[in-house]
Design a protein with these regions (language model features):
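NAD(P)H-binding glycine-rich loop region in Rossmannoid oxidoreductase-like domains
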Residues: 50-89
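Short alpha-helical oligomerization interface
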Residues: 78-93, 126-134
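Conserved beta-loop-beta element that borders a ligand/cofactor-binding pocket
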Residues: 113-114, 146-172
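Glycine/proline-rich active-site loop of Rossmann-fold NAD(P)-dependent oxidoreductases
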Residues: 143, 156, 169-183, 210-211, ...
Length: 328
């Protein structure tokens, strides 16, 4: 199977490429950035702009992929600073990808949407098919992208599928997302021994560890289309408060100092999002099930972070954590 990834240099794409290669796919990457030094052999990299129709069309025509994983996007916090750029990248880029798929016979497009697609005031857990009235440009473009994909599916028969990701957590440092505070508790906690989060201690949103997120994309892509009743699916794994995350980090990094100082703009965005998602359709229609809870995520994440840090301020105490859990 041949797969093209847009936004391949981002937080999701960086980790998704080796997963797809391990499943036997031939992978081509499409990103405005240069190819990273860590790029696996055999992976093609195209330095292209998703907002330029001709560049997208040429890449799809040349590569002839069976599927496109459309990951390119400007995230929530960055999108509020540059809303016109967010519209161009997220909306025009999505239109270019869908039109290229139509023109050159791509079978499937996988789309990544977000909890930011939902607006404030919805009762938790937020269902899969509720009204979406987002309060950020990022959310607006993702809702529009979902609808555009539905249009191409209905009018042209494109196999359009997607997930609404919660806040994604990985060892790759994020850029421009409102849920970045979670990753920075782990990264800066190990690297510097301290971190001041830009949210309140009681802040709570749905989260997911990156290995679960990557598996969800691949499993949805490979799911039997006859079972699917939706195009877009809510998915989540855990919904801890910010201070509960801090406690999990502190248990593993003795002496770490984690504090909270709410930034009004980012807090406003965060407070407009759901605290929990109802993802029953994903469970029922393609057997979605997360594997990582807060403890499992914290153990794996700090193992990866501390392994790459040359001189971490605080060493990860894996044995102490394992012993404290007992056999439960």
């Amino acid at each position: 199977m041949k797969i093209l990834l847009t936004g391949a240099g981002g937080q999701v794409g960086t980790d998704l490429v080796p997963i797809l290669l391990a499943r036997g796919a031939k992978v081509a990457c499409f990103d405005l950035a240069k190819a990273p030094a860590s790029l696996q052999s055999g992976v093609e990299w195209r330095e292209r702009d998703v907002t330029v129709p001709g560049e997208v069309y040429d890449a799809v025509k040349e590569w002839k992929p069976d599927a496109i994983y459309h990951l390119a996007a400007i995230l929530s916090a960055s999108g509020e600073k540059k809303p016109h750029t967010a519209w161009r990248v997220n909306m025009e880029g999505t239109l270019n990808v869908l039109e290229a798929a139509r023109l050159f016979g791509v079978r499937q497009v996988l789309f990544t949407s977000t909890i930011a697609a939902f607006g404030p005031g919805l009762p938790d857990p937020v269902g899969n098919d509720v009204s979406m009235r987002p309060s950020t440009m990022y959310g607006v473009t993702k809702v529009a992208g979902e609808l555009l994909g539905e249009y191409y599916a209905t009018k042209y028969g494109l196999d359009f599928r997607g997930v609404r990701f919660p806040g994604l957590i990985s060892a790759v440092e994020p850029h421009g997302g409102t849920s970045d505070y979670v990753v920075y508790m782990y990264v800066h906690g190990a690297r510097h021994g301290a971190y001041e989060s830009f949210v309140r201690a009681d802040s709570k949103i749905p989260l997911m560890y990156m290995p679960d997120a990557l598996r969800a994309l691949v499993e949805l892509s490979e799911a039997d289309g006859k079972r699917l009743k939706h195009r877009m699916y809510n998915i989540q794994a855990l919904s801890p408060r910010a201070d509960e995350i801090a406690a999990a980090v502190a248990k593993r990094l003795p002496g770490v100092r984690l504090t909270f100082q709410s930034d009004p703009e980012r807090q406003k965005i965060l407070d407009s999002w759901p605290q929990e998602l109802d993802d029953r359709p994903a469970h029922e229609e393609w057997d979605w099930a997360p594997k990582f809870d807060l403890d499992a995520m914290s153990d794996d994440l700090l193992t990866k972070i501390c392994a790459r840090e040359p001189n971490p301020k605080i060493a990860y105490r894996a044995r102490a954590v394992s012993a404290s859990r007992g056999t439960a």
